């Protein structure tokens, strides 16, 4: 990319900081992921700056310019946070780092250094180890631009050293694969292949990771990386790398009551690799079907997690059967998968609302397909059952849940032979839209979902009857024979009261 074009893409607040540091006699560069994204033609999420100015010198410069800085906690690591144009920018002094076995992520010692080359040498991957100055010159000492051109994620230096230093880098490698769609390469002897040759997720050579180092990582950091991976455009590719290298089978840790507790990541997924499915319906084994479904879905965390977990019950001894034609089948696997999903999300410390939603998506993901052959009455019964028993407190939550479930269903179906049948996929989409519309129009759950308010009902019934009255109206609307409209609801209630009292109540 043209040097002038790179600089032109920098936001003004970033240029102001670079120019101010340069004018004061210091080196200053945009560094890391922002440079990578600019070279790829992507919009960076943020713009980190590195400089040979020490934190106190950066602070003095900010004070002279009346620039706001955030609290100075970051100075312990040579970092000053400058807030300009309402946006925070990390300005970090060139530094070196030393790691030891005492911590799986944080360096044992840091020090300031005077060289950009030394600062870039401590970074994780070549595509993240580049710097850009205000004139548009890219400083690339480790072949980052070449790896970008070849779509490669490669550690800076020797992979074994990089991962022994900071175990989180192994998860970051998988995350960048998921976000960028690049292949991962490293030094050393090639490992064995993994997956089905000819599929999008086949790995010709699995890299060797010191995965046992993950045990010292905090659950919070691991979950953050895993979520970023799941939301990547190529999440399936990143997950395949995690499983093939053994990362998914590892544990991290969480501190509870003063002691560390081991938390498994996702070892339950291992048995899906190579697990055969009925070729009448399926293209791939269960794991690669899962990956394709994930990549076929919208990048929303609840959807992605539901698809990761939706087939975990397949192949288990209490689920799998072999049919008379010799083909495998997994009847009821969705219930087993939902049970496993609940345990997994709980141990990964997800909140109750999120967990219940994902578990519901997993449990319900097989319900849509039979509905293609049924009528409106069956759809309504299903909706009413889930309105009463699902993880929803309001109609809006129910509608949102069915929108998510539609996407889970379509992604799951689209990872089978059905993906080749455009008419069937269109019918599936239409069914989802029909169910969502029905939920929006006639499936209130709470009193607040009705078009009448409690104060209006108090003019018609005693206060101790309000709850039952709301329940009556909700039931009528859900049954489909009463629209959720203000006048219609009051008319229906008046009619009911007239039958009960032998007279008709008129509001005054």
What are these regions (language model features)?
Residues 1-508:
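Catalytic cores of the polymerase beta-like nucleotidyltransferase superfamily
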């Amino acid at each position: 990319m043209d040097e002038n074009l790179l600089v032109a893409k920098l936001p003004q607040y970033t240029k102001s900081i670079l120019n101010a540091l340069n004018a004061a006699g210091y080196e200053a560069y945009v560094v890391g992921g922002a440079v990578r994204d600019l070279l790829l033609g992507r919009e960076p999420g943020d713009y980190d700056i590195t400089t040979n100015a020490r934190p106190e010198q950066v602070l003095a410069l900010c004070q002279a310019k009346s620039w706001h800085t955030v609290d100075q906690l970051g100075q312990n690591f040579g970092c000053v946070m400058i807030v300009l144009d309402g946006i925070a920018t990390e300005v970090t002094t060139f530094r070196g780092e030393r790691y030891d076995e005492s911590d799986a992520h944080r360096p044992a010692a840091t020090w300031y250094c005077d060289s950009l080359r030394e600062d870039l040498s401590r970074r994780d991957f070549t595509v993240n180890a580049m710097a850009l100055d205000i004139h548009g010159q890219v400083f690339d000492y480790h072949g980052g631009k070449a790896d970008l051109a070849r779509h490669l994620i490669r550690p800076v230096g020797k992979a074994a050293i990089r991962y022994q230093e900071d175990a989180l880098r192994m998860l970051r490698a998988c995350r960048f694969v998921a976000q960028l769609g690049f292949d991962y390469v490293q030094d050393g002897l090639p490992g064995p292949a993994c997956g089905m040759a000819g599929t999008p997720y086949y790995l010709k050579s699995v890299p060797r990771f010191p995965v046992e180092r993950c045990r010292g990582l905090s659950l919070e950091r691991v979950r953050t990386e895993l979520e970023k991976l799941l939301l990547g455009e190529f999440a399936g590719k990143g997950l395949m790398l995690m499983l093939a290298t053994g990362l998914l089978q590892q544990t991290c840790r969480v501190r509870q009551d003063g002691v560390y507790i081991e938390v498994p990541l996702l070892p339950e997924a291992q048995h899906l690799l190579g697990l055969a499915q009925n070729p009448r319906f399926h293209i791939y084994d269960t794991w690669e079907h899962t990956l394709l479904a994930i990549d076929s879905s919208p990048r929303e965390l609840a959807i992605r997690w539901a698809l990761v977990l939706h087939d975990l019950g397949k192949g288990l001894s209490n689920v799998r059967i072999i049919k008379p034609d010799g083909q495998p089948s997994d009847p009821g696997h969705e219930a087993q998968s939902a049970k496993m999903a609940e345990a997994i999300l709980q141990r990964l410390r997800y909140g109750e609302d999120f967990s219940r939603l994902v578990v519901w998506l997993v449990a319900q993901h097989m319900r849509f397909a039979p509905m293609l052959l049924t009528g409106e009455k069956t759809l309504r019964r299903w909706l009413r059952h889930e309105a009463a028993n699902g993880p929803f407190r309001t109609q809006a939550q129910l509608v949102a849940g069915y929108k998510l479930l539609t996407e889970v269903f379509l992604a799951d179906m689209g990872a089978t032979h059905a993906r080749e049948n455009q008419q069937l996929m269109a019918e599936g989409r239409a069914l989802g839209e029909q169910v969502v519309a029905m939920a929006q129009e006639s499936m209130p759950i709470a009193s607040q979902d009705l078009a009448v308010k409690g104060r209006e009902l108090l003019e018609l019934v005693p206060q101790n009857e309000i709850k039952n009255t709301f329940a009556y109206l909700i039931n009528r609307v859900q049954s489909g024979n009463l629209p959720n409209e203000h006048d219609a609801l009051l008319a229906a209630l008046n009619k009911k009261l007239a039958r009960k009292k032998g007279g008709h109540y008129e509001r005054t």
